[in-house]
């Protein structure tokens, strides 16, 4: 299918990334859509582009170059397109051309987004994921030398596969007192004989869908990642001890998939199991842990965990808790993926009070771009960014959030930190 935008201009240069035989085929001048983002997006996204262009130039000496293509979602989108009568109020914030571009060009990157205030609008980040069925939220967490509240942050090296399309984040909920809430509570009490709603007259109510298909496709991706990246274990994190038919089912379906598709063998009497990595013969342990115990274990024994597969709400808590251990969400990268599309993103918010001050840490979106380059197979450029980040932090020329926690640090602006990274390539 050709990309035929109704409002945006087509890209003026570059070539399309394609998929053949389930593999990404990346030309030397790929078109990469980017969403600048709201608030501090105007600070961090140009810094990221500068770092990425420098890494690509240094790694490939001009042979490869990204053709950046700006697309629009959020406040900037609304300000640009609010007078377009052919767009609905929702489309003025979430441009249909943008969805089409992200789907068509396969790989994209975005800054943080403002969610519009008012009825009918939920998170734009969630809307993007749901519209394109980007069912994996991928959050790698490792230490780059930044200030940390824990004694041994270097022991943290995990990759979280968070299910993106289900759980209570599906947004199936109704306000207390609404006709829908009353109707559903009445149905539960009278048809299904539910007696556990403590205050039925004053309850808002929500639904938590967890499916076998949703679980299997997430767990499959997590195990494939462990195989491809030589990881020692995959841990299912859940609250199946309390929610047996949703989170408990997630765990059971996960183990069943590992056994059925990857020939995992039960250890002792289970449920843990083990499979051989077909690429190198090493053992990969498939295990599970209750979510609250896991949040303790990542502090006490982080080196025992590698790839994590979990549902939406747990994944949100876990990825931010882990990020805090290695320097905070200011440098936590992330991506949203399905079987063909990868959308990489800054994982923090818009921080409007810092917008335009050239002050904040651009690390999150820069490291998300590093993930993007690796996803594209441009490993040499990605490696340059990782080493430049480590060297920049070691040099103590850092943005204010790190400078205030480091002895002898020199505080630099957002754009200057990008320059420090480039000097360290």
Curated annotation (Swiss-Prot):
It holds the Pfam family Iso_dh. It comes from the Bacteria. D-threo-isocitrate binds at residues 123, 125, 129, 139, 162. GO terms for molecular function: isocitrate dehydrogenase (NADP+) activity; magnesium ion binding; NAD binding. The record marks 169, 239 as: Critical for catalysis. Keywords: Glyoxylate bypass, Magnesium, Manganese, Metal-binding, NADP, Oxidoreductase, Tricarboxylic acid cycle. It is an enzyme of class 1 (oxidoreductase). Its cofactor is Mg(2+); Mn(2+). Binds 1 Mg(2+) or Mn(2+) ion per subunit. SMART domains: Iso_dh. One of its GO terms (biological process) is tricarboxylic acid cycle. NADP(+) binds at residues 114, 348-354, 361, 400, 404. Mg(2+) binds at residue 316. It catalyses: D-threo-isocitrate + NADP(+) = 2-oxoglutarate + CO2 + NADPH. Its EC number is 1.1.1.42. Belongs to the isocitrate and isopropylmalate dehydrogenases family. Catalyzes the oxidative decarboxylation of isocitrate to 2-oxoglutarate and carbon dioxide with the concomitant reduction of NADP(+). Homodimer. This is Isocitrate dehydrogenase [NADP]. It comes from Helicobacter pylori (strain ATCC 700392 / 26695) (Campylobacter pylori).
